[in-house]
Amino acid sequence: MRDKTGPKFGPYQPDDEAVSPSRRRLILGMGMVSGALVLGGAKTAQAADCRSPDVAGTQDERWQKQPFYGQHQAGVLTPQQAAMMLVAFDVLATDKTSLIRLFKLLTERLAFLTTGGRAPSVNAKLPPLDSGIMGPEIYPDNLTVTVSVGNALFDERFGLQGQKPLRLQRMTRFPNDSLDAGLCHGDVMLQICANTNETVIHALRDIIKHTPDLLSVRWKREGFISAHAARSKGQETPINLLGFKDGTANPKISNKPLINNVVWVSNNAGEPAWAVGGSYQVVRIIRFKVEFWDRTPLQEQQTIFGRDKNSGAPLGMQHEHDEPNYAKDPEGKVIPMDAHIRLANPRTIETQRNLMLRRGYSYSLGVSNSGQLDMGLLFVCYQSDLAQAFLTVQERLNGEALEEYVKPIGGGYFFTLPGVADANHYLAQSLLEA
């Protein structure tokens, strides 16, 4: 029998237990909004059925949508959208019951936001139920919100210690890292992607509005790829802010057996049963020293990466997706031994187990206190085994020539939850009911 506090039964009344006086006042204020939500529940449910009669048959990108329900979450294999945001949260829930309430509420909101519909109206004397930044109609706009959990969620707070994924750990410092504690880790990570920044921001504000007693933002970063790359639906490799294609060597999404092996946790992985269908997510905020890089000779840039800057082809080859044959270049005369692509993937039988799926975005934040441009890469990758993939590859990359131009400053390791089967289930259900 379904728990009637779940997503099928509308919004939740916040719990006063273990809440500070200031937060209690905030929650009481939210109670007015919750009441309006309950009164308008039927209308809200109807609005969730996203209809677009005025644009039927057109190519209006605002009506593009990704499926919310399925074996795996969207946003991992989904072709990269143009806009992206990474948001790490601390969980304010104090027990397992309230944690379940959080994930049911997240499921409800994400199912609505990724489907779209008309924003419900309320009495003008009450806070509006929607920010309004998308207008009266909430378009799906190709939105995906991928939910992952961090190592800290498996501490003693919720009794989940015995259910932690085997390879999940707190991100530690590599030799070239200069980690800012305020940009690291988190209990919950949301990767929010859509066609436009407005949709990404709207989704974040909706989630924060509905979870004031359950989540607190720890850090966030916004990213982008070119509109051309996004519209290509994965056929055009994005170019990073160093001017090189980023993600050329990704495994092909169309190769399902390979993707199942590289990305998704399987039944025979020895992981907790609930984790099957999930994936290890690595997030790294990597700042680029672009002024220094822009004064570096082209030949040196290309030997650092091991690729032609224009075509993306491995040095000595013609096309981006040509595979380098290192056996024919044993001394690194064509592609240097310490080139980024050669260290990251030596292309031996043994190193095929180290593959991962990258899904990175560029970021630009203005200038530093010293007047230098603050921009770089939001590196995101997914793999079925954190130790075998990212950690092993990063160990090979330690000391590479590229380190002179890049500086990792934040991020974390997370576990991307399996998908939600249907409307009768919720995110993290197999974990929380294990």
Curated annotation (Swiss-Prot):
Catalytic activity as recorded in UniProt: heme b + 2 H(+) = protoporphyrin IX + Fe(2+)
InterPro entries listed in its UniProt record: Dimeric_a/b-barrel, Dyp_perox_C, Dyp_perox_N, Dyp_peroxidase, EfeB/EfeN, TAT_signal
Enzyme Commission number(s) from the entry: 4.98.1.1, 1.11.1.-
PTM section of the record: Predicted to be exported by the Tat system. The position of the signal peptide cleavage has not been experimentally proven.
GO cellular component: cytosol; periplasmic space
Binding of heme b, residues: G247, T248, A249, H340, N345, P346, R347, R358
An annotated Gene Ontology molecular function: metal ion binding
One protein family per Pfam: Dyp_perox_N
Major location category of this protein: periplasm
Role of this protein: Involved in the recovery of exogenous heme iron. Extracts iron from heme while preserving the protoporphyrin ring intact.
Family indicated by similarity: Belongs to the DyP-type peroxidase family. EfeB subfamily.
Protein name: Deferrochelatase
